[in-house]
């Protein structure tokens, strides 16, 4: 019987119990370390799980109970939320960022979370093969990130990429988001909502490899072989590398989990198998390395998706072991969604770039690119203000645009083909933005700025989904090409399912679907556009973006990780760049602001840095505020007078850019 796909049986198997144990023992990350443990489930759900566990000899209920604490978050929302989508690093913005974290390149640049991967990509691809381009480099960069920071991305997941070339017809958007298995249906998590987060049922069909291969075939330089892009990463996994701060801290957080699941996760354990490897230790991933070498020799990704190949068979066996429903047909039938990027003009004749049309390219498909464009269209009705960051009027405009953007996101969902569905066309219609602009102007008469008194006035259509996790990188090359790519396995270590034969860590992307008959605490129904269906991709908050100058040259390449904070972080980065005329270093380092409409409050990364005067002004406008642990990570590259200024979000994830 497939667990959670129907009524939960009275006797749970061992692996499911261990996964429930895993979910309940992870903690909220405070000041970079798990200083207090908080359950991720409601008290009702916990009681149901405890009742099930009482009949098991595998785990004493009392051991689990000591980890359970009352959820004291005051957001008024669903208590089944969690904070297991971000690494446990100390994260803090900066008003005085170190200038050495701004990297300046004459030929090209890579902005990502991992300097080791950016250096490897530049040396082994862009410099080793002079004719290679950003699309080629993106393959190596993505695979390297999944190899090293395997807690938040990898070939067991999926994502989105936007490519821009010299000509308009070169621009491309690829949706390689995971797909729901063909046996999926909207009732599948009705009896066990936690099963969308952990175990085999949480796994969507991985798409990262197919997406990277399609990018390579469609927009690669043709001057480098597929094998040349894969081998450097395979060799890294074979030889190994020194564990950095982010991976070390995340492994430490999950130590009890991996000791419990040591049979499948032995590669993260020390030589005596009584603990995980630590920061500074040497780690190898031989299984993944061997599998990548097989793909390199094959010259394609065919073995990964071939139902008769040992790679695909091993993956399916592993997912089935943990009660998953993904089968060989799901894997063999997976395809990506290739379209032109969504695009629009901004800042025509704006104060600081006279007579200049900036073209914004962003992702289509199941991403939130359409919502980002809707917010930019709203913001484009308001004037620039140099130095306007956290000024009264500009901040009001930005916050209200964020709230309307959340309303737009509630209408989004996966679709196929080039034509946009009516519910997505609606939010891209200038009339929709005009409605928001009129509301903003009506409530800011004579300098008296007021947010709308009730969130319902922003007209969200459905519950606003809250995705998690993610990793992003931006690349520009010496030929004028750019890549903005965001990829994820969703929560930390995805579904916690690892195939020790192939080295694949599987996503838990099924958690990003809406759950049928489960309205949120604000009585908003789940989105009809985002229910689990066979072959469907769940809605993502991802919005990898490239901004082109009037000459068609990449001017800003940007994207973010951080779940629902992705779109607001990308929006604020673009607004700071083109509305406030801020340098890219300060744009990324400074504290960020976030509003997703529900819960109806502003989230601020640092009250002290923003200051009492600004906080008082926001309160007068009618906003409720909460200081939060920084959760979004932005990696971007800016064209400054022909030079590439690359900045990674060191302040939130220790990223350092690389240039050449």
UniProtKB/Swiss-Prot annotation:
Biased composition (Basic and acidic residues): 78-90
One GO term of the biological process aspect: glutathione catabolic process
Spans through the membrane: 14-34
Subcellular location field: Vacuole membrane
Topological region Lumenal: 35-660
Catalytic activity: an N-terminal (5-L-glutamyl)-[peptide] + an alpha-amino acid = 5-L-glutamyl amino acid + an N-terminal L-alpha-aminoacyl-[peptide]; glutathione + H2O = L-cysteinylglycine + L-glutamate; an S-substituted glutathione + H2O = an S-substituted L-cysteinylglycine + L-glutamate
Keywords attached to this entry: Acyltransferase, Glycoprotein, Hydrolase, Membrane, Protease, Signal-anchor, Transferase, Transmembrane, Transmembrane helix, Vacuole
PTM text: Cleaved by autocatalysis into a large and a small subunit.
Induction, as annotated: Induced upon nitrogen starvation. Repressed by ammonium ions. 6-diazo-5-oxo-L-norleucine and L-azaserine are irreversible inhibitors whereas serine-borate is a reversible inhibitor.
Glycosylated residue positions: 119, 191, 270, 298, 454, 517
Main location: membrane
One of the record's GO cellular component terms: vacuolar membrane
Positions with a binding annotation for L-glutamate: 177, 488, 490, 509, 512, 540-541, 562-563
EC number: 3.4.19.13, 2.3.2.2
GO molecular function: glutathione hydrolase activity; leukotriene C4 gamma-glutamyl transferase activity
Pathway(s): Sulfur metabolism; glutathione metabolism
Family under the similarity heading: Belongs to the gamma-glutamyltransferase family.
Binding partners and assembly: Heterodimer composed of a light and a heavy chain. The active site is located in the light chain.
Name used for this protein in its record: Glutathione hydrolase proenzyme
Species this protein is from: Saccharomyces cerevisiae (strain ATCC 204508 / S288c)
Gene name of the record: ECM38
């Amino acid at each position: 019987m497939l667990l959670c796909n129907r009524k939960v049986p009275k006797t749970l198997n061992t692996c499911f119990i261990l996964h429930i144990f895993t979910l309940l023992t992870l903690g909220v990350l405070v000041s970079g370390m798990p200083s207090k443990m908080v359950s991720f489930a409601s008290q009702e759900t916990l009681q149901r799980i405890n009742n099930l566990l009482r009949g098991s000899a595998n785990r004493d209920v009392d051991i689990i109970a000591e980890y359970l604490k009352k959820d004291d978050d005051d957001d008024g929302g669903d208590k089944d939320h969690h904070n297991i989508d971000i690494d446990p690093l100390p994260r803090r913005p900066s008003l005085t960022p170190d200038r050495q974290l701004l990297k300046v390149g004459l030929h090209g640049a890579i902005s990502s979370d991992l300097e080791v991967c950016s250096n490897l990509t530049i040396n082994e691809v862009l410099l080793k093969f002079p004719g290679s381009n950003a699309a080629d480099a993106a393959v190596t960069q993505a695979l390297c990130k999944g190899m090293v920071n395997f807690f938040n991305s990898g070939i067991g997941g999926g994502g989105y990429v936007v490519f821009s070339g010299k000509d308009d017809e070169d621009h491309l958007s690829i949706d390689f988001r995971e797909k729901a298995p063909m046996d999926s249906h909207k009732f599948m998590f009705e009896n066990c909502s936690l099963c969308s987060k952990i175990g085999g049922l949480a796994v969507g069909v991985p798409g990262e490899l197919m997406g990277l291969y399609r990018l390579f075939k469609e927009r690669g330089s043709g001057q480098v072989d597929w094998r040349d892009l894969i081998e450097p990463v395979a060799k890294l996994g074979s030889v190994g590398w020194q564990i950095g701060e982010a991976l070390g801290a995340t492994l430490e957080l999950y130590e009890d989990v991996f000791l419990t699941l040591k049979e499948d996760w032995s590669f993260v354990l020390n030589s005596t198998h009584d603990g995980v490897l630590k920061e500074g230790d040497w780690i190898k991933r031989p299984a993944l390395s061997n599998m990548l070498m097989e793909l390199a020799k094959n010259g394609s990704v065919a073995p990964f998706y071939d139902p008769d190949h040992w790679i695909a068979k091993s993956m399916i066996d592993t997912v089935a072991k943990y009660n998953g429903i993904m089968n060989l047909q799901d894997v063999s039938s997976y395809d990506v969604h290739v379209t032109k990027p969504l695009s629009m003009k901004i800042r025509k004749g704006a104060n600081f770039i006279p007579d200049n049309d900036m073209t914004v390219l962003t992702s289509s498909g199941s991403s939130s690119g359409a919502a980002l464009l809707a917010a930019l269209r709203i913001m484009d009705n308001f004037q620039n203000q140099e130095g306007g960051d956290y000024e009264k009027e500009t901040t009001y405009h930005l916050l209200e645009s964020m709230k309307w953007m959340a309303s737009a996101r509630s209408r989004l969902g996966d679709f196929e083909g080039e034509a946009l569905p009516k519910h997505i066309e609606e939010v891209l219609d200038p009339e929709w933005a005009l409605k928001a602009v009129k509301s903003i102007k009506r409530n800011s008469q004579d300098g008296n700025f007021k947010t709308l008194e009730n969130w319902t006035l922003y007209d969200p259509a459905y519950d606003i989904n809250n995705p998690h996790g993610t990793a992003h990188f931006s690349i520009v090359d010496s030929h004028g090409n750019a890549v903005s790519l965001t990829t994820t396995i969703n929560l930390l270590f995805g579904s916690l399912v690892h195939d020790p034969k192939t080295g694949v860590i599987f996503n838990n992307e099924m958690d990003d679907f809406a759950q049928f008959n489960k309205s949120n605490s604000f009585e908003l129904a789940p989105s009809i556009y985002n229910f689990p269906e066979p072959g469907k991709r769940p809605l993502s908050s991802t919005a990898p973006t490239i901004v082109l100058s009037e000459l068609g040259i990449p001017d800003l390449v940007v994207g973010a990780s951080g779940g629902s904070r992705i779109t607001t972080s990308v929006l604020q980065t673009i607004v700071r760049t083109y509305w406030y005329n801020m340098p890219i270093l300060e744009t990324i380092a400074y504290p960020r602001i976030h509003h997703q409409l529900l819960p109806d409050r502003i989230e601020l990364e640092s009250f002290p840095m923003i200051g009492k005067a600004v906080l008082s002004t926001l309160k007068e406008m009618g906003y409720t505020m909460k200081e939060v642990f920084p959760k979004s990570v932005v990696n971007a590259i800016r064209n400054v007078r022909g030079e590439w200024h690359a900045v990674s979000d060191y302040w939130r994830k220790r990223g350092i850019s690389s240039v050449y």
